[in-house]
Structures are given as structure tokens and as C-alpha cells.
Amino acid sequence: MSSKKAINIIVATSTNYGIGYDNKMCWHIPEELKHFKRITTSCDDKKKRNCVIMGKNTWYSLPKRPLVDRINIIISSADYEKISCEVSDCKDNIKVFKNIEDAFAYVEENEEIESAFIIGGAQLYNECLDKYVYKIKYMYMTIVYDKKYECNKFVAADVIFNNFKFEKKDVYNSELKYITMKGYNKGISYPRDEPAD
């Protein structure tokens, strides 16, 4: 059964679907970061906020933490206590859970949250694609193709393209550096007149 709220994945990859090297992004494209912020902060209901869900390595890799104007959810079983103590003074904006199931339950129960975005890293992306693809409504995907990047963390592209439909109207090509695409989960029914983001 799919979620009542929109749970989405947003990911940027190289042309061979790498997402980073040793827990660091391999590119820095300000326009793409603005796209990420716009997608993850936009709410139809101005009284609500979105949340971003990430693993601990993604959390620690953020230059500025937490990501503003969003509830930040960190998933870590091994370092749950440590991270919980580190963020104890930001309980309104940061939540820590031991597993993704608890995070999904929190999203469903929290009336302040409009949509959720899974933002990495590779382990969390691939766990969600493997076990919870039926919950994922939209796939926001950026492919960076300005040059070849060396990556050692990858996302399961075969699962993405087998389960999400990307339409031409939802593809944007940005000055020969990257393309952004919005994919619709083939297993979820929803109005097709929704505007592209």
C-alpha cells in the first residue's frame, strides 16, 4: 500500500549513475543545488513544511546543518544515541530514527509535514528502491553530464527506470551541464494533470 503523503526520492547522478566518492559529491553546480532546494522546500499548503530523510553520512557531509525550512530526519541504527545527543537542542527541526520504517511512520503521523524527500546516501536510496519502491510517488533525478566523474557510490538505475515513467514534458536540459527529470511511479494512480516541477 502506498503512503497517504507523497514520499519522493531526489537524487543527482553521473552518467553511469554514480552519486559520490567516499561520501562526498563529485560536482558542485550552484544551479542544481537551487533546484534541489526549490523542490524540497515547495509546499502547496503554506502552513506546512516538507522533510528530508537521509543517512548519517549524508548528514555529516552537509556543509551547513540542518537544511533550513525543512524537517531533517536522520537514519542511523549504529549511531542513533550519538546523533540524538548531538542534535538535542534542535528537536523541532531534526529527528533521528534507527530505521526507515520508523521515519515513514513519523511522516504519516506528523500533520505539519506535507511531503518527504529521501536525499541519500547510496545505502538509503537503494534500500528504499529495493524494499519500499511502492511507497515512492515521484523520482526527481538529475543527471550531470558535463564530464566524466569518478564515483564509488551508485544508485540502482535499473530499478528506477523499471518502476518510474519519465515524460518529455518533465525533462529540463540545463546549458549542457545536466538534465533534470521528474518520474512518476508506474504502480501509483494519481491525476496526470499535476504540473511539472
Locate the predicted segments by residue.
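Enzymes that bind and transform nitrogen-containing heteroaromatic metabolites
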Residues: 2-197
